[in-house]
Amino acid sequence: MLKLAELKETDTIIDTYCGIGTISLFAAKKVKKVYSIEIVEVAVLDARENAKNNNITNAEFLLGKSEDVIKDLISKDVQIDAVIVDSPRKGCEESFLRDLASMGIEKIVYVSCNPATLARDMEIMRGLGYKLGAVQPVDMFPGTYHVECVVLMSRVAPAK
């Protein structure tokens, strides 16, 4: 997943729906700064502890709905190079996707456990100036019909 994003050590990224920070902590080793967003308070506390235990100081774990925290980052004019969206099964709210596009982010790595909401959200992003790049299904649950899918989207046009 991180390989798809082609992260650089000068990048500032966002990891939405970050849980206990697993992806954030791996990404933090490759980039300048990670803003990690999670709505579950105990998960944020665990993520902060995980960062401390691993001597990671460039990951900031923010408590709140991704949809709200993104608006706060926009109001602070935070410049972001890439975003990792590990979406819930219901997918993302359209307003959240519009906010991401409004930030001028060049690369979005979208992780989904629901092909239907993935397709819906990809269509929204296409309309917001992004194209679909690499797609990698991941069989995290062998013997079941569940599949995770990792998708790279790249900006090709300004937000509409």
Language model region names:
Residues 1-160:
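Rossmann-like S-adenosyl-L-methionine
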